[in-house]
Amino acid sequence: MAKYFTKRVLELIPKILVITVIVFAVLQMLPGDALSRTIPPIQYNQMSEVQKEAMRESMGLNDPYYIQFVRWFGNLLKGDFGYSQSTGSNIFEMLKNRLPATIELTLLALIIAGVFGIFFGFIASLKQNSPLDYINTTASIVGISIPEFFFGILFILIFSVYLKWLPSGGRMTVGIDSFFDRLKYMIMPATCLGISLTATLSRYTRSTMLDVMGKDYVKTARAKGLSEKDVILKHVFRNALSPIMVILVMRLPMLVSGTVVIEAVFNYPGMGSMILDAISAGDMPVVMITTMVVAIVTLFASLLVDIFTALLDPRVRFE
């Protein structure tokens, strides 16, 4: 397992380098002065042309691109991501505040999808071709077909505007910093984010359970006189759970990408809304850096998928 883990980690290195090279190249092609993306805008606007040129020389902005890339990559490793052109804020500080919010939202969506998707699929498999099974199948198709932002608007209208049970946006109440307060703000966006995955898991759980029910070892267990409860839980569900969990974890990178739209709908202060705000303001340094961070987070999520898959299915390690 250690050898497999090391191999997967080493495979990340060239991928991360490619991402950083692309981001650096795009930043270099942006119109305007590269110095304005390196220092705070207020400081840049107060400098004369002579001072700007002297600073460009001292910071190596006139050096060949490959030297600039090495220096820029080294600054990234130290947490120096530059400054926003629209707000003048340090991009690293912006990320430090936004990234944890997106991670919290994604993990909650994953938990919601895992619990409800597997539960609904489990029940549907036991009630095959019953009205409950047809309702579950129809709901799954609806959950997969309708975009997440529609559910977001619908949830806001029902639970915030009409019922007034939950806040329509934000991350926490001013002056209150507790887990349950943040949970109150996260429950709607996380549920909307996880609806598609819940529907997918429900259908996959049902089909996997039905497939396992037809296996010879399940028939043998019934022939031995085991109770239906023991057959389902110990022989059917246990053997069906491994591929189901693989599907659940494999969708983690897609959840990270889906936060962009959901955070905008609920005005949730995470990475997704940060990217959209930067695009609206034409703040390309922030757009490129946040895109790079999301891509790297997605790569690490994919690494977790590979490791989790290998833990559940040892055959993967030897492929």
Regions found by a protein language model. Give the residues of each.
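An internal, D/E-rich "acidic patch" concept
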Residues: L61-I118
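Alpha-helical transmembrane segments of integral membrane proteins
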Residues: A2-K3, L99-L132, I176-E319
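Membrane-interface helix starts
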Residues: L10-P14, V18, Y65, L107, ...
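Alpha-helical membrane-inserting segments
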Residues: V18, I22, V26, F116, ...
